[in-house]
Amino acid sequence: MKSEFEASPVVDAAPWIDLRRYDQSWFERGKPGWFILWWWFVQAIAFPLSLHNSHGFRCWLLRLFGAKIGKGVMIRPTARFTYPWKIAIGDYSWIGDDAILYSLDRITIGSQCVISQKCYLCTGSHDFHDVAFNLIATPIVI
């Protein structure tokens, strides 16, 4: 008896997902491509090389790229932000080491919140009921 992994594929069956039909041309990143590349460059160099307690510097960089950052916010040097112009962080909140804010849509973090190390906030997913596996982006509010 063959296991399910040894069975021959059914080549005539319609695929559940057809990635040839995937299209995200409708998706709006919110800024032009050169601006996004500039942000990725700044984040890759300035964040990890900034001093341990340079929270103000990292907040300033995020604000420079459009994030709404409250007072007293602490952001660790290894935190990552996909599109800072889609992020708002309230007063006295902390973003821990290796936290990733994957902001295809808005991410709003209130005051006095902690997004701890290695947290992954993801506003994007895919519609696995759709044969084209289209992108879904939904805001996160904490």
Specify the residue positions occupied by each region the protein language model found.
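Terminal amphipathic alpha-helical/low-complexity segments used for targeting or macromolecular assembly
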Residues: 1-67
